[in-house]
Amino acid sequence: MSDLRQIAFYGKGGIGKSTTSQNTLAALVDLGQKILIVGCDPKADSTRLILNAKAQDTVLHLAAQEGSVEDLELEDVLKAGYKGIKCVESGGPEPGVGCAGRGVITSINFLEENGAYDDVDYVSYDVLGDVVCGGFAMPIRENKAQEIYIVMSGEMMALYAANNIAKGILKYAHSGGVRLGGLICNERQTDRELDLSEALAARLNSKLIHFVPRDNIVQHAELRKMTVIQYAPDSKQAGEYRALAEKIHANSGQGTIPTPITMEELEDMLLDFGIMKSDEQMLAELQAKESAVVAAQ
């Protein structure tokens, strides 16, 4: 158990976090690692590409059916997928009712008590990261996840979420062993995306672990409920995920305590990269358009 690496993938909704994590973990198992995935996203889509199936039944859903979590057996919630990867989805309540983080807390406690963490090299938490509320921060707060990898892109809200997640890590870094492992950029083909990702990583006292290029083969594999590693193992994109997996595998003990920036500093960075226009630029453009309209009359 001393060699167990507990990693977590955080990122804003829709960033491709679950797809990136599952492809990376499929590549890690190909390196001979034994893996347990704990899905901590209410969408419960953290394991479907590994299981080649629709979203699996969640711990909270099964507990509600049986009466309580104490009535469940480990085999009820744990399914084996690609090359023996163990998969669990914590789940969440009905929309608008209760705290979605409660499922995370309930699941992790149940799994630990029932020996799910025995005989694995990696436990990977796939966590929603738009908001780092108490429940979703649980893998960080309770000193479970030791290495956090933030999946982001060059889009403003993805950068904003990455900075917020870094704030959550910083809050618990001194009381526990949690560290920021690095950023993973899931390309959205925005302007100067690689440069911007590297710059944000540097500002956060971290590094860009890997830049994952955009490729439609990812969607083709997803439609078949498969990772690219399984669907097209010889493809260039599969090679990208293998490179990412190797970098994470080599990154043990190299995490850092992040240095999040303010919203103003983030906006200044976007201005420096020409991604966002200043008020003066926008006003000048508006005046130029108005002048052109007047001149045309």
From Swiss-Prot:
Q: What does this protein do?
A: The key enzymatic reactions in nitrogen fixation are catalyzed by the nitrogenase complex, which has 2 components: the iron protein and the molybdenum-iron protein.
Manner of cofactor binding, per the entry note: Binds 1 [4Fe-4S] cluster per dimer.
Complexes and interactors? Homodimer.
| UniProt binding sites for [4Fe-4S] cluster | 99, 133
Name the cofactor(s) required for activity, per the record. Answer: [4Fe-4S] cluster
Please state the Enzyme Commission number of this protein.
1.18.6.1
Q: Please report the PTM annotation for this entry.
A: The reversible ADP-ribosylation of Arg-102 inactivates the nitrogenase reductase and regulates nitrogenase activity.
Question: Which family is annotated?
Answer: Belongs to the NifH/BchL/ChlL family.
Q: What is this protein called?
A: Nitrogenase iron protein
A GO MF term: ATP binding
TM spans (from-to): none
Residues annotated with ADP-ribosylarginine modification: 102
- Which residues are ATP-binding? 11-18
Keywords from the named record: 4Fe-4S, ADP-ribosylation, ATP-binding, Iron, Iron-sulfur, Metal-binding, Nitrogen fixation, Nucleotide-binding, Oxidoreductase, Plasmid
Q: Which NCBIfam families match?
A: nifH
Enzyme class at the top of the EC tree = oxidoreductase
